[in-house]
């Protein structure tokens, strides 16, 4: 039996795991669009909002950012 997920989104905690603040909304938007149009969510929740579901999936490592090596070049090197 699958467990229902209760979730409290903390964007700052998500940024600690994924340090690409501009990539996170893009990934979430693309996943939310997929959920809305054709994809089955990876998590079970009472929340029906595709954006909330996509954030849950990203936070719980059900989805990830592809080509992360390319994004690493965009992180500024601050001294």
From Swiss-Prot:
Q: Does the keyword Transcription apply?
A: yes
Known catalytic reactions: RNA(n) + a ribonucleoside 5'-triphosphate = RNA(n+1) + diphosphate
Record GO terms (molecular function): DNA binding; DNA-directed RNA polymerase activity
**Top-level taxon of origin:** Bacteria
InterPro entries, from UniProt?
DNA-dir_RNA_pol_omega (IPR003716), Pol_omega/Rpo6/RPB6 (IPR006110), RPB6/omega-like_sf (IPR036161)
Q: What is its EC number?
A: 2.7.7.6
**Keyword Nucleotidyltransferase included in the entry's annotation:** yes
GO annotation terms (biological process)? DNA-templated transcription
Record's Gene Ontology CC terms? DNA-directed RNA polymerase complex
Q: Which UniProt keywords apply?
A: DNA-directed RNA polymerase, Nucleotidyltransferase, Transcription, Transferase
Q: What does this protein do?
A: Promotes RNA polymerase assembly. Latches the N- and C-terminal regions of the beta' subunit thereby facilitating its interaction with the beta and alpha subunits.
Q: How does it assemble?
A: The RNAP catalytic core consists of 2 alpha, 1 beta, 1 beta' and 1 omega subunit. When a sigma factor is associated with the core the holoenzyme is formed, which can initiate transcription.
The entry sums up its family as follows:
Belongs to the RNA polymerase subunit omega family.
> What's the protein name?
DNA-directed RNA polymerase subunit omega
Classification lineage: Bacteria, Thermotogati, Thermotogota, Thermotogae, Thermotogales
């Amino acid at each position: 039996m699958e467990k229902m997920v209760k979730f409290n989104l903390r964007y700052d905690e998500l940024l600690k795991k994924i340090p690409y603040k501009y990539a996170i909304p893009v990934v979430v938007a693309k996943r939310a669009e997929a959920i809305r149009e054709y994809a089955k969510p990876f998590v079970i929740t009472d929340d029906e909002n595709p954006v909330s579901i996509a954030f849950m999936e990203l936070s719980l490592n059900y989805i990830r950012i592809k080509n992360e090596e390319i994004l690493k070049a965009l992180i500024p090197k601050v001294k």
